Regions:
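Repetitive helical segments and hydrophobic/amphipathic motifs
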Residues: 11-12
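First exposed extracellular module after export/assembly in secreted or surface-exposed proteins
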Residues: 28-159
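Bacterial Sec-dependent N-terminal signal peptides
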Residues: 2-5, 15-39
Length: 159
């Protein structure tokens, strides 16, 4: 499963433009911003001691639109592209009793994506395509909106 996930991510990402692009339509919702970003295979770094707890691959993406106001009143959701669909992070897969996770941290002006396995032998992720959604004001979102469902978020963004 780890190998399948890595291969699927690499194959899918080869067809994607590698630049971070802001989806900025004039009809979009002012409370949401969304970006497509592809982390290239050479943009992954390692942290920790191989074979030990905490060994992981990570990549950092600068996003100036993650402001103090977003940190205090909004939210950031990230979706990973797998097999032409987007799934919310954290993404967890299980193979032969070992668990692979793709997670993220949000900082002022930046997000960090990290990948690790419970067997402490994480394989380099390769290229990974993400959708990053910034909710500027959570209180202004409708109750029916499931922010874990990228299609709902995209539909709401384009209202």
């Amino acid at each position: 499963m780890k190998r399948f996930l890595s291969i699927a991510l690499m194959a899918t990402s080869l067809a994607i433009i590698t630049a971070c692009t802001k989806d900025d339509s004039p009809n979009g919702n002012a409370n949401l911003e969304h970006f497509t970003y592809t982390i290239q295979s050479n943009q992954w770094y390692t942290r920790g001691v191989y074979g030990s707890l905490g060994w992981q691959y990570y990549s950092q993406i600068d996003i100036p639109d993650i402001t103090k106001d977003v940190m205090e009143n909004g939210a950031v959701m990230i979706y990973i592209k797998q097999n032409d669909l987007f799934y919310p992070l954290p993404a967890i897969t299980d193979e032969d009793g070992w668990v692979n996770t793709v997670q993220f941290n949000v900082y002022l002006g930046q997000v960090e994506i990290f990948v690790e396995d419970t067997d402490f032998q994480t394989v380099a992720p390769g290229a990974m395509t993400l959708k990053i959604v910034i909710f500027n004001k959570l209180k202004s979102l409708p109750a029916y909106l499931d922010i874990k469902d990228y299609k709902q978020v995209l539909s709401y963004t384009n209202k």
